[in-house]
Amino acid sequence: MARVSRQTPQQYSGRQAHPVDEVLPVAKLTLYGFQHVLAFYAGAVIVPIIVGNALGLSHEELVYLINADLLTCGVASIIQALGVWKIGARLPLVQGVTFTAVSPMIAIGLGAGGGTAGLLVVYGAVITAGIATFLFAPFFGKLVKYFPPVVIGTVLTIIGLTLIPQGLQDAAGGAKLIGHPGYGDPKNLAYALGTLLFILVVVRLGKPYLSSLAVLLGLVAGTAVAWLLGDADFGAVKDADWFGVSTPFHYGMPKFELFPIIAMVVVMLITMVETTGDVYAIGEVTRKKVDNATVANALRADGAATILGGVFNSFPYAAFAQNIGLVRMSKVMSRFVVVAAGGFMIVLGLLPKAGSVVAAIPHPVLGGAAIAMFGMVAAVGIQILGKVDLREERNALILAVSLAAALLPNAVAPFFERMPEDIRAVLNSGITLGSLTAVLLNLFFNVFTRRSTMEIDWDDIEGDEPEEAHGPLGAHEPAGAHRPAGPFPPQGAHAPQSPHAPQSPHAPQGPYTPQGPSTQQGHYDPQGTGNPQGPHGQQGPHWGAPGN
């Protein structure tokens, strides 16, 4: 994993704009903006496809979800990059739907009967969670210390493990084929495996930028092969409109139910940790000073985007890490490039015919790509846990009990069947149940007793390699998954020091370092490597997918 230079941010005179604030010529804005869209696209569309398929939506309804998602992604990215009042970090951050919300939204939607009726309950929870995020943004910095590596690593592992079954289900043919002879057909498995192998080959042999598009290229290649063999149906594309606008509350007024709201607020808490890490990471890459106000503005943008998502028939939003890596690789730091990318996404969100093409991707092809992306989320979580002292019984119990809680809904489907119907929205989501368990156990073991878990030095995990060796997110971090987020120190605070280490002006203490005596010395320094980590999962080495 490449390390970002650890120099003091360069000072710019009043006449010299910081590169982040530089307005490039239209041709360059167009080129670099489209580059961001390519790196982002696969991760942007896969969430509405997976959620829509799981809830049993029709092709037309799926197209609407995809277009609404892209439209909201564009608006959210523009708000984050340009800034409106105290909303938006004014940094080159691209916004996308977080993978963290996938499993809870499916559980909420199915618990409400599936279909568009289930979506109404999902949207009520999304809107409320967005409002909570917006209001809570200025105070979140004080809570980051309650998300130490043992919690972050456990949550990311849970996210990956609970999402992988969704990918496997699509690989076998999709939820609609369960109980039919076509489910698990060897041909379906061959398409899924072929797509997965294609992605792996692109990452292995492709140049950095090409590798950043591995998931997108895998989806295109797998769909093309399926079409040539007569297994992809694009008949609905010709009937789709060329132009269409997503309207607020398209499926009706949202329904606000307590336990779905609790589940979605938990999702947004995890997402806020991720966004905090993303903001410090992009500040490090661009040499732009980041402070608590910047983080609060970014979190408000997440909240505002999530509210918009619920109103315009989409989902919760957070920054996409693979685009941060793209900024590092291209050296183009202008936030107006992200504004251009947002414009492209808005245009794509107004083209139902383009959305219809995406909705026609065969389930097995989608499943092959999803396995890679979701598996990487779990891998990143395991990577973080590898730096936690699991010989310490408390840490081991946090991991063990949280994993057991998260696996209950999938491993034993009727486990909570006799619980009150309203509370099942929380209990039937492995991500929500497991994450709550991890946070509460950490409070019980390590906070109320004034003990803290060790901190992580990301350089120890990834190795210290030359920056030039990598593209978007480092050669060892496939994208497709929302990255692990963590408490990132502020710009310039690259390596929080151990209490027993000599103080150095080059490594000041960051305000987000967990407090209290540590059971083992170490450093939690994600952005010291130059690769943003966050709980949407790791947006992966060079793959275009996502997470956060």
Regions inferred by a protein language model and the residue ranges of each:
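N-terminal signal-anchor module of multipass membrane proteins
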Residues: 2-92, 100-112
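Juxtamembrane interface elements at the cytosolic ends of transmembrane helices
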Residues: 6-14, 44-48, 52, 194-205, ...
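Hydrophobic transmembrane alpha-helices of multi-pass solute/ion transporters
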Residues: 14-15, 19-23, 31, 198-201, ...
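Membrane-embedded helical hairpins/re-entrant loop segments and their flanking transmembrane helices
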Residues: 26, 52-90, 263-335
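Hydrophobic, membrane-embedded alpha-helices of multi-pass small-molecule transporters
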Residues: 27-40, 44, 184-196, 213-214, ...
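Short, non-helical or kinked segments that cap or interrupt transmembrane helices
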Residues: 64, 87-101, 145-152, 210-217, ...
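Membrane-embedded alpha-helical modules
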Residues: 108-232, 342-454
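Terminal cytosolic tails of multi-pass membrane transporters
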Residues: 430-494, 514, 532-548
